[in-house]
Amino acid sequence: MKTLTQIISPIAAELQQFEAFFGQTLKAETEPMNSIMRYVLDSRGKRLRPILVLLSAKLFGEINEQTLRAATFVEMIHSATLIHDDVVDDDDQRRGHASVKAQFGNLSAVLAGDYLLAKAMLLIANDTDILNEMLRTTVAMSEGELMQLSGLNDYLEIITRKTALLMRSCCVIGAMSVGAAEEQIQRISDFGLHFGQLFQMRDDILDADSPENVKMAMELLPVYQQETLKLLEFFPECEIRKALKDLSVFCATRDL
């Protein structure tokens, strides 16, 4: 199986541009917020959501400044939700490092998450279609998290709201940023939703926190992987479609 670095090679240059823009955007005018933002940058994950934005944009056009803003916006939203989740779940570890909550305390973590959310909105305020897409998704994510905390047992609904809708929105706003046609946006939206569902199913299998969820995920994952790959057949053959296919297989079979 290809490594993630190999898979995303068609957008390697654009991903570097994203990293520079993301780092610049996170800078705060005061301490200690700037120190917390540097810590967030140093604790980076796979950047899967910006990768989806960039790949979806490049599938339909040329990556531009609006694409980079959209990718930065979505990573800021994602980072904020992780920081807040660690406060809610009382988790001291995130991506092999101390969580923001463990490193700086609950109050600072809540404020850091709020800072990221507010700054993300400022970044994309003039791109109203992208902003509205992400606001609807953020509402659904909050509802999904509360459904899980409340002990509700609708597995597919919870993972769709908690994870898959954000992945879907990444694909949608990437396509929007290059002026993709409505039908193209709908096609990549369908792909993104299924991709997000299979990603979370694999996560649940690896975490093994809930035997019921593991059983459900193991039953559903092969079906959703097949359907996700099938949805890519609507797009012309190209290196970006191949990258999305390889990324889907990677996320469905990864060990981390």
Over which residues does each language-model region extend?
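All-alpha prenyltransferase/terpene-synthase fold signal
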Residues: 1-256
